[in-house]
């Protein structure tokens, strides 16, 4: 027998029935668990339910449910217990989790966000675009140059996640983070006309697979930053839209060893730093050792740091973000951008065109 239960009912059930629960204390006051414990376990729970259930040896149903007891036995949840689990489910403001009882056994699932392909959480298909007049995907503004070209990707997840408004808007429970600095508004009517399907999860997230995992930028109706800067407006003139903020100017006309910094504009200083970084990187490549290449790159990076660095900063920042970003979407886009920069012919062309000049610099050192 299946019985869907909300968080309050689950807590009552666990306290009043045979369902395993933490024994009530005889003390009159409850110990308040630190919030960071809740956050830690909540993130770990999301990871297991969405991505790593099979890797952890758990049996996951096609609808995403996993036995609660088997989760509590995992090392990463040692010390959590049923009481804290129920508190996490009840207190999650984004309603990420649902629990149900099946013949006396408790199960839990994530409502959306899975990367496990075999999982198909039941969702309501949206057949009329008028029911979702606003569909917005939140991300980081640093990713716009990539997204503007390739569109939105579901990455390793099963769907692209959107919301019906911005964080804090009435009725918006989940689907967009407070930390987002870029908002991409989707023309759902146009997309649906082309056969793109949209779904609504149990906690109100708007989901789509796009076409083969990608939602083309042609379905973007408006893109703006959290500061109000408009990067794209489908109703505006194309020349007013900024799909790529990369510099198109030629840095070759600037002397990379110029000391007259006062005569250079900020734009020229940025291009000059790019050449410094390229020189450092190229020096290492010519010497033929990756260790020296890194040293050479660092040397170029240091030279350029006082000039408003561009290429060195871009690559260094991307590498750093790969260590701190946990979201699949962000990581995959960053990897693609980093690969694009590192695998492009820019460094090779630079070395080929300036080989003698670079070798001369190396010999002088």
Curated annotation (Swiss-Prot):
Biological role stated in the UniProt entry: Catalyzes the last step of tRNA splicing, the transfer of the splice junction 2'-phosphate from ligated tRNA to NAD to produce ADP-ribose 1''-2'' cyclic phosphate.
Keywords linked to the UniProt accession: NAD, Transferase, tRNA processing
Name of this protein: Putative tRNA 2'-phosphotransferase
Gene Ontology molecular function terms on file: tRNA 2'-phosphotransferase activity
Native organism: Schizosaccharomyces pombe (strain 972 / ATCC 24843)
A single cellular component GO annotation: nucleus
Pfam families: PTS_2-RNA, Yae1_N
Residue ranges of the region described as Disordered: 1-35, 231-254
GO terms under biological process: tRNA splicing, via endonucleolytic cleavage and ligation
InterPro entries (UniProt xref): Essential_protein_Yae1_N, Ptrans_KptA/Tpt1, RNA_2'-PTrans_C, RNA_2'-PTrans_N
Low complexity bias locations: 17-27
Catalytic reactions on record: 2'-phospho-[ligated tRNA] + NAD(+) = mature tRNA + ADP-alpha-D-ribose 1'',2''-cyclic phosphate + nicotinamide
Cleavable signal peptide: none
């Amino acid at each position: 027998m299946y019985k869907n239960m909300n968080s309050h009912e689950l807590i009552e059930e666990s306290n009043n029935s045979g369902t395993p629960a933490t024994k009530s204390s005889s003390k009159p006051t409850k110990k308040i668990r630190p919030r960071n414990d809740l956050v830690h376990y909540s993130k770990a729970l999301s990871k297991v339910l969405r991505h790593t259930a099979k890797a952890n040896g758990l049996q996951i149903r096609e609808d995403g449910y996993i036995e609660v007891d088997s989760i509590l036995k995992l090392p990463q949840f040692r010390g959590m217990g049923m009481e804290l689990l129920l508190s996490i489910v009840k207190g999650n403001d984004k309603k990420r989790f649902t629990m149900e009882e099946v013949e006396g056994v408790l199960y839990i699932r994530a409502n959306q966000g899975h990367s496990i392909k075999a999982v198909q959480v039941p969702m309501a298909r949206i057949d009329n675009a008028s029911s979702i007049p606003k569909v917005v995907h939140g991300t980081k503004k640093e990713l716009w140059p990539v997204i503007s070209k390739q569109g939105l990707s579901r990455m390793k997840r099963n769907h692209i996640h959107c919301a019906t408004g911005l964080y804090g808007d009435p009725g918006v429970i989940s689907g967009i983070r407070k930390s987002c600095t870029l908002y991409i508004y989707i023309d759902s009517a146009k997309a649906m006309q082309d056969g793109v399907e949209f779904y609504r999860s149990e906690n109100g997230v708007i989901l789509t697979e796009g076409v083969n995992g990608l939602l083309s930028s042609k379905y973007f109706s408006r893109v703006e930053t959290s500061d109000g800067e408009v990067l794209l407006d489908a109703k505006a003139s194309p020349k007013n839209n900024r799909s790529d903020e990369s510099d198109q100017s030629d840095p070759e006309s600037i002397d990379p060893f110029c000391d007259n910094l006062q005569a250079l504009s900020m734009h020229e200083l940025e291009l000059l730093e790019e050449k410094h970084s390229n020189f450092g990187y190229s020096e290492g490549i010519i010497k033929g050792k990756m260790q020296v290449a890194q040293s050479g790159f660092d040397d170029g990076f240091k030279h350029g740091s006082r000039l408003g660095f561009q290429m060195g900063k871009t690559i260094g920042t991307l590498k750093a973000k790969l260590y701190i970003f946990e979201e699949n979407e962000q990581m995959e886009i960053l990897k693609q951008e980093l690969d694009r920069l590192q695998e492009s012919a820019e460094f090779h062309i630079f070395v080929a065109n300036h080989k003698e000049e670079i070798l001369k610099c190396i010999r002088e050192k």
